[in-house]
């Protein structure tokens, strides 16, 4: 089909640049949506990153109330098939058990996304209920990493990252409850920010009852796209359980200035876990770059009982997920998850967590509090802490050890297999602090390797400032002169 841009031109535009062209009436929102749909047709057979396209939103971008004269002005956008609902659209959460599920209303963030001028044209792949580290359920779909389709996408924002990395579109919705924005962003050469609590609403379905470990966000190829997304989509809904805060200056403006020289701690030894030796050498290269930019960097690890923290976080996930599944069962009039519709590890998580006591939950929350206080003290001395985004190389497809298709009979053992590779990102989810994966390195396989910067609560702007400074140091674009094996411009 004819497209409004060449594929090279399309791939060179971020969402902010597309929005500017829309504002100048050089292109229309329908033309951009059609080009994104053509991009899906071009690369999705090799990736399985996009679950569904919404034909009416492609033909008529004003469908469902998208504001075409606001913010992004109709730039095409994918919603992860998990998280805030999209009214009347399928949201099947990567599960046979949820087939046919259609939310009756837009989630609050969905409304903000529409008001920001983003045209929701489809939904992206996720592991079943977002639980595991890769979207690989042959009964539903198997998503692939566009940098090398023999490798996993990681997760749970699997399809979002694969789509943006492959050039389908420049910006996509993502969620993060332990690293699900940052980890796949790190393996796809993207920017992935997990914001501080109180930035993106989780209304109407969720509140503090979940421990508030999960939040919303996006993945992008440019820092300014992430900054603009936050500026446009942040804010709380009526009846929130906590105040939702705003920065004193829009991030889109703030990122144009370099941060002041920062004190950055660096580590790869996180309790019982440490990074692959190649990752350590890449971490050392990042340290050198930061020092060249004028930052003070020292090898220091936060004084935290990581073993206790991981145990508490595991309790949180197990108890949260068990109650989530139990509510679904009650709505469907079932007493147990059907084994032919729900993946085996997810059934075992439900079994283990269903009868967790209030005392166990209290102990978990007590650890959350003590770890948060300890980390807060650490950030009195250090502006940030730097690690790799994950500790071990991206696995090849089909590595069942990390999948909810695993036959591991021990749920705790399965979670600790995850922590061995996803070691560094859960801390920010537990404490409600901010973390960002920045595409600064490569794995021995050639896949991208993100570098993960964490900081104190409400210091998200400084993370973005540093990311923008690093982006400028790379010549204005991360990972220049290279692109994935599967890409719209190939």
Regions found by a protein language model. Name each.
Residues 2-6, 72-95, 256-267, 318-376, ...:
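Short helix-loop capping/hinge segments that flank enzyme active sites or metal/cofactor-binding pockets
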Residues 18-24, 78, 97-101, 214-221, ...:
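Short, well-ordered beta-strand elements within core beta-sheets of diverse protein domains
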Residues 25, 74, 80, 115, ...:
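Glycine-rich, small-residue loops and helix-cap segments
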């Amino acid at each position: 089909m004819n497209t409004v841009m060449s594929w090279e031109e399309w791939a060179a535009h971020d969402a902010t640049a597309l929005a500017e062209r829309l504002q100048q009436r050089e292109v229309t929102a329908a033309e951009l949506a059609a080009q994104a749909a053509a991009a899906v047709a071009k690369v999705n057979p090799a990736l399985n990153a996009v679950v569904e396209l919404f034909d009416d939103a492609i033909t008529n971008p004003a469908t469902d109330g998208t504001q075409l004269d606001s913010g992004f002005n109709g730039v095409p956008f994918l919603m992860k098939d998990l998280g805030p609902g999209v009214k009347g659209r399928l949201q099947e959460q990567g599960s046979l058990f949820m087939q046919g599920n259609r939310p009756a209303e837009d989630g609050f963030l969905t409304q903000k996304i529409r008001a920001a001028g983003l045209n929701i044209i489809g939904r992206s792949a996720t592991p079943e209920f977002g639980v595991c580290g890769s979207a690989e359920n042959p009964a539903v779909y198997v998503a692939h990493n566009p940098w090398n389709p023999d490798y996993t996408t990681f997760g749970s924002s699997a399809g979002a990252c694969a789509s943006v990395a492959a050039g389908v579109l420049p910006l996509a919705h993502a969620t993060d409850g332990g690293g699900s924005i940052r980890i796949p962003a790190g393996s796809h050469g993207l920017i992935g920010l997990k914001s501080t609590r109180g930035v993106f609403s989780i209304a109407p379905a969720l509140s503090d009852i979940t421990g508030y470990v999960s939040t919303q966000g996006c993945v992008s190829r440019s820092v300014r796209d992430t900054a603009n997304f936050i500026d446009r989509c942040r804010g709380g809904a009526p009846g929130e359980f906590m105040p939702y805060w705003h920065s004193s200056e829009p991030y889109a403006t703030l990122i144009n200035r370099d941060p002041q020289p920062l004190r950055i701690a660096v580590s790869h030894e996180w309790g019982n876990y440490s990074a692959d030796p190649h990752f350590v050498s890449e971490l050392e290269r990042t340290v050198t770059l930061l020092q060249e930019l004028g930052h003070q960097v020292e090898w220091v690890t936060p004084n935290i009982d990581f073993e206790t923290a991981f145990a508490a976080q595991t309790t949180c996930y197990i108890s949260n997920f068990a109650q989530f599944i139990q509510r679904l069962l009650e709505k469907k009039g079932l007493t147990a998850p059907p084994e032919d519709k729900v993946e085996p590890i997810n059934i075992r998580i439900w079994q283990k967590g269903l009868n967790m006591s209030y005392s166990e939950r209290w102990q978990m929350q007590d650890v959350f509090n003590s770890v948060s206080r300890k980390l807060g003290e650490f950030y009195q001395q250090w502006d940030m802490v730097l690690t790799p985004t994950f500790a071990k190389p991206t696995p090849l497809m089909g590595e069942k050890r990390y999948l909810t298709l695993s036959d591991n009979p021990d749920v705790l053992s399965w979670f600790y297999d995850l922590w061995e590779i996803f070691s560094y990102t859960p801390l920010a989810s537990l404490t409600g602090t901010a973390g960002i994966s920045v595409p600064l390195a490569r794995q021995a396989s050639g896949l991208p390797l993100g570098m993960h910067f964490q900081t104190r609560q409400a210091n998200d702007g400084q993370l973005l400032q540093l990311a923008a400074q690093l982006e400028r140091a790379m010549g204005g674009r991360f990972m220049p002169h290279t692109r994935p094996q599967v890409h719209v411009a190939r």
